[in-house]
Amino acid sequence: MNEKVNSMPRSKKPSYPLDALQVMEVVWQDAEEVGDIGWNNIKDALKSAKKPCPIMHSIGYVINLTESHIALLSTIGPNVCSTLEKIPRGWILRETIIRDGETLEDHREQQKRER
């Protein structure tokens, strides 16, 4: 069922200050803790131990890129944001740039210099 979505013609989109931020999808293998509080069945633990760790997909505004991790925010405003998601580089399977741009850290530094 691959139907094309027809969109109405729209006027030119206005630009916003945070349009300069890079947006990225990160596919990564997460760590996992399996079991409940208290004692757990050893057979269930052995069965779960053989299963691969879950593959996760995160999309967000790139806040910072370091040698050790990528930091993303899913939502950002002028002075508030969602929770920060830090993904260790060793867990990352794929990075896809959805919108090229700068990190929030670089963006804020540039704004300070321009003032």
Give the predicted meaning of each segment.
Residues 2-115:
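Conserved RNA-binding domains used in RNP assembly and mRNA/RNA metabolism
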